[in-house]
Regions:
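Membrane-helix interface/capping segments
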Residues: 45-59, 257
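Alpha-helical bilayer-embedded segments of polytopic membrane proteins, i.e.
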Residues: 1-45, 64-87, 96-110, 204-249, ...
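Cytosolic/stromal cytosol-facing helical appendages immediately following the last transmembrane segment
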Residues: 1-23, 53, 125-133, 137-208, ...
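Intramembrane catalytic core of multi-pass membrane enzymes that act on lipidic substrates
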Residues: 58-179
Length: 348
């Protein structure tokens, strides 16, 4: 029954539902839950770096409940966002309530949308990869599928990687550099993939073209089915969701670097090239994304198999608290700069 702990990841959609059903301070329910309740629970429950024996590992490989707990996020996310669009179409809100609703929807899309899409995007089954792309749609970040899988995992912890934050780089400047570079790199990688198979720019297999068709159609569908207000809200929440994603990218690799070998190539990705976190609640809610060192060490590993490595650098607090800390650059630098290995300290 240990696998059922990941049902706790559905508490974020539950908090989002409360936000969408409320007025006043209630519209901030998901925000309060994500950045007050979860950090508090991380402190109270602490860390867990337990490793599984061989029999438990084998059970986790074949037990499909881990997969279904991911799949259910798709109808949950689209169902809740549809409800939210209905609410913003039929109800009147103050400026403060609009902010609460937007942030709450952005948190839902980031945690149960982008995060789950990221996990499914590393799978081999066509249906799982398709589900991944669908979950990226409301986040307006479909190109991330290409750049992350074919770019970031190859270039992580190098100056060439847009998703690796440099030492002394603030999260706000990182938003600009990461978002712009990852988009450009996604196009570059797409053209390389097409060229490798002698396919033209207008090929059916140009996923980037499809993404630029599908995402506007999604926005248009929100306009037709709901309202202009809902359409603008959909755009705003999509942007908020991928900025939350970029906060996570920021804390996952901040200041860490791979060095070039005598051959001129970068050293192999090791467990010390990502910041790890074993805080229990953050691990569960984010489907073990916080064990990021192991994810980069072997990206084909499913979330339920990810483990902690002793040589991995560790964040002093869980992911929710780390995101908050990153939003205050002086505090982030004060806490994290001393933890970055001296030989890696190459400032932006």
């Amino acid at each position: 029954m240990k696998e059922l702990k990941y049902l706790f990841a559905y508490t974020v959609p539950m908090a989002a539902f409360v936000s969408f059903s409320s007025t006043g301070i209630g519209t901030y329910a998901a925000v309060i839950y994500a950045f007050v309740v979860l950090p508090f629970l991380d402190v109270v429950l602490g860390k867990n770096d337990t490793k599984w024996d061989e029999s438990e590992r084998k059970n986790r490989i074949v037990n499909t409940i881990f997969d279904w707990m991911l799949y259910l996020n798709l109808p949950m996310v689209f169902g809740l966002m549809s409800y939210c669009f209905f609410q913003v179409t039929t109800q009147s809100y103050t400026t403060s309530e609009w902010i609460g609703l937007s942030l709450s929807a952005g948190i839902l899309l980031a945690t149960n949308g982008i995060n789950v899409a990221h996990e499914l995007g590393h799978r081999q089954l066509f249906v799982e990869r398709t589900m991944s792309k669908i979950l990226y749609i409301p986040c307006l970040y479909m190109h991330f599928y290409i750049e992350h899988n074919f770019g970031h995992h190859m270039k992580v912890a190098t100056p060439e990687d847009g998703a690796t934050a440099k030492y002394n780089q603030s999260v706000y400047w990182f938003w600009i550099t990461s978002v712009s570079k990852q988009y450009a790199d996604a196009w570059k990688k797409q053209m390389e993939l097409l060229s490798a198979k002698n396919r033209s720019f207008f090929s059916f297999y140009n996923d980037m073209l499809w993404y630029h068709l599908i995402q506007p159609l999604y926005i248009l569908a929100v306009l037709v089915l709901f309202s202009q207000t809902a359409m603008l809200f959909a755009i705003a929440t999509g942007v908020i969701s991928f900025l939350f994603l970029e906060c996570i990218n920021y804390i996952e690799h901040y200041g860490l670097l791979r060095f070039k070998t005598d051959s001129g190539r970068y050293e192999r990705v090791q467990t010390h090239h990502s910041w790890n976190s074993n805080f229990t609640i953050g691990r569960i809610v984010l489907y073990e994304l916080t064990r990021h060192s192991d994810h980069h060490f072997k990206s084909s590993k499913k979330y339920q198999l990810l483990e902690s490595h002793k040589k991995s650098p560790h964040l002093p607090v869980g992911y929710p608290a780390s995101i908050l800390m990153s939003l205050v650059p002086p505090l982030w630098f004060f806490v994290m700069n001393p933890r970055v290995p001296t030989e890696m300290k190459q400032s932006v």
